[in-house]
Amino acid sequence: MKKSSILFIVLFAFCSQPSSVDDAVDVTTTTVLNEMIIDEEEPELYVMLMWHQHQPFYTKNDDGYYTRPWVRVHATKDYLDMVELVADYPEMKATFNLTPVLLRQLEDFSNGAKDLYWYYTEINADILTQEDKDFIVSRFFDTNPKVIARFSRYVELRNSNQDSSLWTNQDFRDLQMLFNLAWTDPKYLAQEPLKSLVSKGRDFTEDDKFVLLNEHSKLIDKVIPTHAELWKTGQIEITTTPYAHPILPLIFDTNLASVGDIGAELPKNRFSKPTDAATQVEKGLDLAEQLLGQRPTGMWPAEGAVSQEVLGMFAKEGIKWIATGEHVLSKSLDIPTFKRNTK
């Protein structure tokens, strides 16, 4: 007789912090969910990989541009490449959690929405105002240093950005290009037409910017359909999160905070809206079904926040399983926090 354990690994594509390709995901949870006895001598370990893809809902300015670029650039650097990588290995299975707020924004970008960084990239470098230049210099180095290091011209501009008043129009045009190239997965940079732009390296033209942004649009357009297709074939499972990425137990009842933390300071005015909490679950599933063609049967509660009181809400909507962190499991089982082999 042997024990066969299921190891559940959740990997996060960071919400907004710039990261290199190597740092794009981080193993944050390794929780033994279940043990079962089978007739073998050697132990087996079943590994479940779950990628949690999320961006907060970014606001738009008065001109209708998203104030942050992170949905777009994570789509071009991470979201599409990760699911295509799974597709390259047909025998591999994985789970992707796509939050409703991320899906809404991806759909918006596919329908023509733009962010401020896109807006400042489109402006012809020959007519940039001082305000435009200040934004570009202050924000277009929002990239992991390891990624910047792959582009010699990017390094050159970073090292001289304290003297940007001496920059030429070409310097600004190159920076407009390099920020967006850096936030494109190497897989796509190795393919035409982006391969030629990478080889060029500097002295970019306004036409080059059009080519690059057009490729970004194409990549974004593929993110949702590619996930939907792999889900349809059964190679991946897609889960989602309650609609607005809420801390669901606190919507149900703020007093539930004291269950996980006896010393928690509760608000003076207790808040309890169980129907709102249930609506969050329902609307999240509705949006996922609308955009992906199927209704998920698994869910990742936002921040892994769960309570006994909200579990029934998931079950009522047809959810068969949810995921959370090992700290929740250890408290539920009344055992010490799991320890790691630090060697």
Set out the residue ranges of the language-model regions:
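Sec-dependent signal peptide recognition
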Residues: 2-9
